[in-house]
C-alpha cells in the first residue's frame, strides 16, 4: 500500500478523475464526489492499474459530512500529503442581467462556500509539509461568464490568500492552470465546439503531475 495519501475533491469526472488515476501510482487516493457510479468506475480503473483508492461519495457543500470525512482521515492516517481541489459548478452561460438565482446560489455553494469550509478542515491534515492544489481558469472572464467567473474568482482569492499566509510555515499552496480540455464542464460552455483540438484530461493530468508533485512551492518561502 502507498504510504502517501492524496485527497481529491471532485474526483468523479474530467481532470479530477484523471489526476486520481495518475496519482494512484504513488499515493493512496481518497476520491470524493457525489456520483457513486462514476466513483466506482474510477475505482475499477485504479485497481486495474495496480493502485488503491478509498471512495467517499459525499457532497462537499455539506459541512457536517466534510468534517466527518476529515476526522476519519485523521483517525486512520493522522495526516494527508496532498489535497487536489477539482470540484467546481459550471453554471450555464448567461447575461449578468438574467442570471438564474438558483444557479448562482449553487455556484456560490460549490465554488466558494465549500472551499472556504474545506480549507480550515484540511489544513491541519496537511500540516507544514503537505501540498494543496487549486486550478485557475483564465477563460472564466468576459461576457456571459458572470456566475461562474465571479465564483471562480472568489475561489482563487481564497487560495491566493492561503498561499501568501502559508508561505513561511506551510503547507505549500499551488495554483496551476490546465490547458483547455475535452470535459463535460467545457461542453456546457461551448456545446457546439470542435473538440478535436482540445487536450485529453488524462494527458493534461500527466502534464500537471510534475508541477503538482514538485517539492518547490509556487512561491519561494523566505
Regions found by a protein language model. Give the residues of each.
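Conserved mid-core segment of classical short-chain dehydrogenase/reductases
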Residues: 67, 88-105
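Conserved glycine-rich cofactor-binding loop
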Residues: 12-13
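Catalytic loop of short-chain dehydrogenase/reductase
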Residues: 88-89, 124, 129-168, 177-180
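Catalytic Tyr-X3-Lys loop
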Residues: 97-116, 133, 155
Amino acid at each position: 500500500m502507498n504510504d502517501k495519501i492524496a485527497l481529491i475533491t471532485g474526483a468523479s469526472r474530467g481532470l479530477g478523475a484523471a489526476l486520481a488515476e495518475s496519482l494512484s501510482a504513488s499515493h493512496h487516493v481518497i476520491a470524493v464526489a457525489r456520483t457513486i457510479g462514476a466513483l466506482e468506475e474510477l475505482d475499477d480503473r485504479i485497481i486495474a492499474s495496480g493502485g488503491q483508492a478509498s471512495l467517499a461519495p459525499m457532497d462537499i457543500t455539506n459541512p457536517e459530512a466534510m468534517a466527518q470525512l476529515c476526522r476519519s482521515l485523521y483517525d486512520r492516517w493522522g495526516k494527508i500529503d496532498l489535497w487536489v481541489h477539482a470540484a467546481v459548478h459550471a453554471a450555464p452561460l448567461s447575461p449578468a442581467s438574467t442570471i438564474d438565482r438558483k444557479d448562482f446560489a449553487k455556484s456560490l455553494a460549490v465554488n466558494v462556500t465549500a472551499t472556504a469550509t474545506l480549507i480550515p478542515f484540511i489544513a491541519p491534515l496537511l500540516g507544514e509539509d503537505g501540498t494543496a492544489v487549486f486550478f485557475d481558469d483564465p477563460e472564466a472572464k468576459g461576457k456571459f461568464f458572470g456566475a461562474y467567473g465571479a465564483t471562480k474568482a472568489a475561489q482563487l482569492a481564497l487560495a491566493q490568500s492561503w498561499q501568501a499566509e502559508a508561505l513561511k510555515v506551510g503547507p505549500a499552496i499551488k495554483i496551476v492552470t490546465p490547458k483547455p480540455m475535452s470535459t463535460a464542464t467545457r461542453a456546457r460552455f461551448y456545446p457546439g465546439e470542435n473538440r478535436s483540438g482540445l487536450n485529453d484530461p488524462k494527458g493534461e493530468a500527466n502534464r500537471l503531475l510534475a508541477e503538482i508533485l514538485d517539492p518547490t512551492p509556487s512561491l519561494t518561502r523566505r
